[in-house]
Amino acid sequence: MKKKDTCEIFCYDEEKVNRIQGDLQTVDISGVSQILKAIADENRAKITYALCQDEELCVCDIANILGVTIANASHHLRTLYKQGVVNFRKEGKLALYSLGDEHIRQIMMIALAHKKEVKVNV
């Protein structure tokens, strides 16, 4: 027999609900959501992972790692840059990218560890 994944009656803990609703007003969930959305694209997740493996990569390196055009890699990198996931700098004719900070590396590594532990339905 399959278990229902919903409550069979409607009730809630008013104290918990009020406390958590108040907490939600004090944090930038929308900003967090935007960061996670940026990384959620498979190519951008690959870029993030690649930058976890090497401190700095140029656009050409990333394009070759992903097997995409430089224009496509640049598009994904711009999205990641706008969300603060990656940093960018120019060195001569090279456009070099690195992770925005250690938190991004941690997010990626934790997500990979979590994926190994649970079965994710796609």
From Swiss-Prot:
It comes from the Bacteria. Zn(2+) binds at D101, H103, H114, E117. One of its GO terms (molecular function) is metal ion binding. Residues 24-119 form the HTH arsR-type domain. Keywords: Cadmium, Cadmium resistance, DNA-binding, Metal-binding, Plasmid, Transcription, Transcription regulation, Zinc. Changing H103A: No effect on repressor activity. SMART domains: HTH_ARSR (SM00418). Gene3D superfamilies: Winged helix-like DNA-binding domain superfamily/Winged helix DNA-binding domain. Pfam families: HTH_5. The keyword Metal-binding applies. Residues 59-78 bind DNA. Cd(2+) binds at C7, C11, C58, C60. GO terms for biological process: response to cadmium ion. Changing C7S: Abolishes dissociation from DNA. Signal peptide: none annotated. InterPro entries: ArsR-like_HTH, ArsR_HTH, HTH_ArsR_DNA-bd_dom, Metal_resp_trans_reg, WH-like_DNA-bd_sf, WH_DNA-bd_sf. The N-terminal, regulatory metal binding site 1 has higher affinity for cadmium than for zinc. The second metal binding site has higher affinity for zinc and has no regulatory function. Homodimer. Metal-binding repressor for the cad operon. Involved in resistance to heavy metals, such as cadmium, bismuth, zinc or lead. Binds 2 metal ions per subunit. Metal binding to the N-terminal regulatory site causes the repressor to dissociate from the DNA. This is Cadmium resistance transcriptional regulatory protein CadC. The gene is cadC.
